[in-house]
C-alpha cells in the first residue's frame, strides 16, 4: 500500500508525515517516545529552546543506536565463534565415530 498523510504531535507542534498504513502504529509510538524524551530532557537540562532539545534528543538517539549496533556486532561475532566451535566438535566426533566404526568393522571380519 502507498503512504498516506498522518498527523502527529511532537512537543506541542503538529506535523504531517506520509506513512504506510501498516506502520502507522509504529509511527505513533515513535512520536510518543520522542515526546517523552523531549519532556525528560527539558526537565533534566532546564533547556527551554525547543531546537536545542531536539538536537540533544537526536544525538542521544544516535548514541543509543550506535551502542545497540555494537552489541549486535558483538553478539553476531560471538555466535559465529560458537557455531565454528560446535562445527569443529561435531566434525571431530564424526571422525572419531568413523574411526571407531572402522575398528569395529575390522574386528568382526
UniProtKB/Swiss-Prot annotation:
Its main location: cytoplasm. Residues 21-99 form a coiled coil. It is found in: Cytoplasm. It comes from the Bacteria. Signal peptide: none annotated. GO terms for biological process: division septum assembly; FtsZ-dependent cytokinesis; septin ring assembly. The keyword Lipid biosynthesis does not apply. Keywords: Cell cycle, Cell division, Coiled coil, Cytoplasm, Septation. GO terms for cellular component: cell division site; cell septum; cytosol; plasma membrane. Activator of cell division through the inhibition of FtsZ GTPase activity, therefore promoting FtsZ assembly into bundles of protofilaments necessary for the formation of the division Z ring. It is recruited early at mid-cell but it is not essential for cell division. Belongs to the ZapA family. Type 1 subfamily. Homodimer. Interacts with FtsZ. This is Cell division protein ZapA.
